[in-house]
Amino acid sequence: MKTNLFCYSATGNSLIVAKDIAAMLPETQIFSIPKIIDQDIDLNADNIGFIFPVYFSGMPRIVIDFINKLELSIDKYIFAVCTCGSLPMGTLLQVQKQLSTKGITLNAGFSIPMPGSYIIKY
């Protein structure tokens, strides 16, 4: 089964997670959201994953814009993985709501705690 991972990573934490997932799944490609957001997107995969950091208890704007641009079909397995310094808060619920506006279901959502990168906090 082919898997496409769409990743947004500012500090590298989410990219590491994407690479780890890709290493465990056969036929997996990682796409950088900033590099492909203005291109035609290859959705010819059985599984679609979104991997991104939590920004201020939610999704980064670029990920929201990217999901809004996609024309997903309901026969795909859709999952999201968010990386966070502490808690994901309502981020995965936000992903679910964003996809539901397109008639798509989020099949699974995961959060992975990572080292914090919010400099003001430290």
Over which residues does each language-model region extend?
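FMN-binding flavodoxin-like domain, especially the glycine-rich phosphate-binding loop
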Residues: 1-5, 10-122
